[in-house]
Amino acid sequence: MGIEDNKHVIKAFYEAGNRGDMDACFALLADDIKWTNIGSTKFSGTFVGKQVLTEQLLGPLFGQLKAGISSVVENMIAEGDFVVAQTAGTAETKDGKPYNNSYCQVIKVREGKIAEVKEYFDTELTSSVFGRD
């Protein structure tokens, strides 16, 4: 796949997420996805495989939100198998707190699927909204 194809995969992933279409999001993930959130928040760590990603990251995170995180792609660059996306995410917790964070994701695309993600974000904001434990 070429650079523009890889960027299209990432755009489709964000668009599906914004629609709340988790089936479409998961269809764009490799079965052996490796997702790393930097830092030491309750949502930090490396999650390998769709089931682990769901059980250990997405379930706990989205379980605390009224709806998903709406993402706006501000910048996207690509080279080879990698796409870097700078995004702004907005969400609200079930108890009414805003969770508006900035993200930089370094994403590896393999055979039309998202194979690896390394996500950088404001960890202090995340901990202040969701707690440290």
Question: Locations of the language-model features?
Answer:
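Short, low-complexity N-terminal intrinsically disordered segments enriched in polar/charged residues
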Residues: 1-31, 132
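Residues at secondary-structure transition points
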Residues: 1-4, 44, 48, 98
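A beta-strand edge to alpha-helix "cap/lid" segment located at domain peripheries
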Residues: 2, 58-133
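Short, mixed-charge, low-aromatic patches
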Residues: 8-18, 42-46, 60-65, 86
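Hydrophobic pocket/interface hotspot
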Residues: 10-13, 24-26, 33, 49, ...
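Aromatic side chains
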Residues: 13-14, 35, 47, 99, ...
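Phosphate-binding glycine-rich loops and adjacent basic patches that engage nucleotide phosphates
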Residues: 14-24, 48-50, 67-71, 90-92
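A solvent-exposed, acidic/Ser-Thr-rich amphipathic alpha-helical stretch
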Residues: 30-79
